[in-house]
Amino acid sequence: MKFTQRLSLRVRLTLIFLILASVTWLLSSFVAWKQTTDNVDELFDTQLMLFAKRLSTLDLNEINAADRMAQTPNKLKHGHVDDDALTFAIFTHDGRMVLNDGDNGEDIPYSYQREGFADGQLVGDKDQWRFVWMTSPDGKYRIVVGQEWEYREDMALAIVAGQLIPWLVALPVMLIIMMVLLGRELAPLNKLALALRMRDPDSEKPLNATGVPSEVRPLVESLNQLFARTHAMMVRERRFTSDAAHELRSPLTALKVQTEVAQLSDDDPQARKKALLQLHSGIDRATRLVDQLLTLSRLDSLDNLQDVAEIPLEDLLQSSVMDIYHTAQQAKIDVRLTLNVQGIKRTGQPLLLSLLVRNLLDNAVRYSPQGSVVDVTLNADNFIVRDNGPGVTPEALARIGERFYRPPGQTATGSGLGLSIVQRIAKLHGMNVEFGNAEQGGFEAKVSW
C-alpha cells in the first residue's frame, strides 16, 4: 500500500488497467477453453458415431482385409492428414480383426463388452483415446472408431489461441495509447500544481479551472474559496493589528506621562496622588482594551461553537443585570428588566451569550447620563437594551459596530470594540443585531432570532 501511494496517478491507473485487463483475459481464456472443449468433444463424438454407422452399413462379408489394410501416405499433394485424427477397426464377434485403417487401427485392443463411447489406450501406447463401439446389424461384427484425446485438445487450443492471442498482442498497444491519453488528460492538473507552486501566499486570485476534469473541479472551487477566506482573514488581521497598535499607543503614552508626572511630584503629595490615581485609571483602561482585543481575536478565529447548551434567556438577562447593577448604581443609573414572555430558550455557548449581554449593558450604562434608566426587554423573538442617552447621529449610526469606531463628542472612556464583539457573537449564534435611535429617545440595540 505504501509503495502504491508513492506512485503517480498515471502509473497507478495504468497498473490498475493492466491488472484488470490481465484478469479479464485469463477469465475469458478459461471460459473460452471450457466452451471450446465442450463443443469440440460434441462435434468429434458425433463424427465418430456417424463414421461407425457408415461402416456398419457396408457388406462386411465381402470385405477383403488383405487388399484394404495397406497403409496410405499421410502427406498428399495439397494437404496433410493427421494419423491421430481418426482410426477404426472391424472385428469378428470372436475378436479376429478383419479390417482397419492401416495405421493406428491395427493396435486397437478388442472388447466384446463395450458398447457406445468409452476411453482407452492402444496396445503399447500410454496416450488416451476416445472410442465408440458398435455391433453390426447382423451381430457378426464389432466396429470401433477412435480418436486421440490429445488431437482434440490441440484443436481446442488452436481455436482458443486464434481468438485470444490477437487481444494479448494488442494489450501493449492499448497500454501505450492509455498512457499517452492519461498524460494529455492530466496536463491541466500539472498546470494547476505549477500555479500553486508559483502562487503568492497572500494572493486572492482564484485558480483557473479551465480544462480541469469535472471530478477535480470541486477541489479547485474549494481551494478558491479557501484562498478567498484566507485572504480576507489576513486583511482582517492586518487591519486589526494596525488598529490595535494605534489604539494602544494613546493609553500607553498617557501612562508614560502620568508616570513622569508622579516622578516629578515628590515635593507635592497632592499632585503625586492625583497622578497615581490617573495612572491607575489609565492602567484599567489599557487592561480593558487588551482584554477586548484578545476576546475579539479569539472570536474571529471561531467557526463552530463548542460546549453549547439550551440557555433560558430570562435567567441569562437576570444574571447579567445583577452583574452590572452595582456599577450602574455607582453611576446613578437604574437598570430595569421587563420579561414579556417566559420560557424562551436559545442554543448557544453560555459564556459567549453572557458576554454579549454584558457588553450591551456596559455600553448602555457607560453612555447614559446620571439619573437615567436602562431598559432591558425580553420578547418572543428578540430582546432589546435601550438607554436614555442622547442617541447618535445618522452618520455615526451607519458606522456603529465598526472596530475601534466611537461617535464624535463622547466623553465616556471606551475602545470602540464592545459592539463589534456583540455583532461577532450574535453571528456565531445565528442571531441578528440592529442598532438605532429609540422612538422615546436614546440608543437601543435589538438582538433577534
Swiss-Prot record:
GO function terms (MF aspect): ATP binding; phosphorelay sensor kinase activity
Alphabetized UniProt keyword annotations: ATP-binding, Cell inner membrane, Cell membrane, Kinase, Membrane, Nucleotide-binding, Phosphoprotein, Transferase, Transmembrane, Transmembrane helix, Two-component regulatory system
Pfam family, one: HATPase_c
Annotated localization: Cell inner membrane
Induction entry: By the AI-2 quorum sensing system.
Segments on the Cytoplasmic side according to the record's topology features: 1-12, 178-449
InterPro entries recorded: 2CSK_N, HATPase_C_sf, His_kinase_dom, HisK_dim/P_dom, HisK_dim/P_sf, Sig_transdc_His_kin-like_C, TCS_sensor_his_kinase
Enzyme category, top tier: transferase
Domain of life: Bacteria
Domain Histidine kinase, first and last residues per copy: 243-449
Keyword Kinase: yes
Membrane-spanning ranges: 13-33, 157-177
Any single GO CC term annotated in Swiss-Prot or TrEMBL for this entry: plasma membrane
Isomerase in keyword set: no
Modification type Phosphohistidine: residues: 246
Coiled-coil regions listed: none
UniProt-recorded name of the protein: Sensor protein QseC
Lineage of producing organism: Bacteria, Pseudomonadati, Pseudomonadota, Gammaproteobacteria, Enterobacterales
